[in-house]
Amino acid sequence: MESFVTPQRRSAAEQEPKPTANIENIVATVSLDQTLDLNLIERSILTVEYNPEQFPGLVYRLDSPKVTALIFKSGKMVVTGAKSTRDLIEAVKKIVRNLKKHGIQIYGRPKVQIQNIVASANLNVCVDLERAALTLENSMYEPEQFPGLIHRMDEPRVVLLIFSSGKMVITGAKREEEVYEAVNKIYEKLKKLRAIRPC
């Protein structure tokens, strides 16, 4: 007895393109709750840069994870370049370990606070920015000044730069999850407003 297998048709929901997002940069402040002798750090760790006449902080670059830390006498650090929270924490631990290894005493545990996450995203559809600007609250679109629509989202509290190609830049997130939440939320809003179409 012959059996025929008919190919299953994909539902419209399965065929619908899904938005994607990538974390590009995490900026965080770190507090060591103690003062640091930057001259001693410069003498101990040869790879750092310290030129107090030009800038009051010491520049410490890591290759893996690829981050840059600005270290100040106050024991505060600004860390940039991490592509994930995990990389950020790993970088801070590595810096503190290296300082200790070179005889710099660190007494407490570093307190890390994310200040800003910058991400890129692609809705994988084209956006009618004119329509979106008219119907999307907290938005500004002035194409003669800037080609993208600026949307300030209340929850999560982020700013999205949306381009007609469906590409976006997201700033202001404090947690990685907020980036993905914002991308999905704006996609659903634009879809509901009929401001998206296949490219």
UniProtKB/Swiss-Prot annotation:
Q: Name one Pfam family in it.
A: TBP
Picking any one GO biological process from the record gives:
DNA-templated transcription initiation
- Lineage: superkingdom: Archaea
Give the Gene Ontology MF terms in alphabetical order: DNA binding; DNA-binding transcription factor activity
Q: Which UniProt keywords apply?
A: DNA-binding, Repeat, Transcription, Transcription regulation
- Outline the sequence repeats, range by range: 23-99, 114-190
Q: Which family does it belong to?
A: Belongs to the TBP family.
Which function does this protein serve? General factor that plays a role in the activation of archaeal genes transcribed by RNA polymerase. Binds specifically to the TATA box promoter element which lies close to the position of transcription initiation.
HAMAP family, from UniProt? Answer: TATA_bind_prot_arch
The name this protein goes by in its record: TATA-box-binding protein
Give the organism the record lists: Pyrodictium occultum
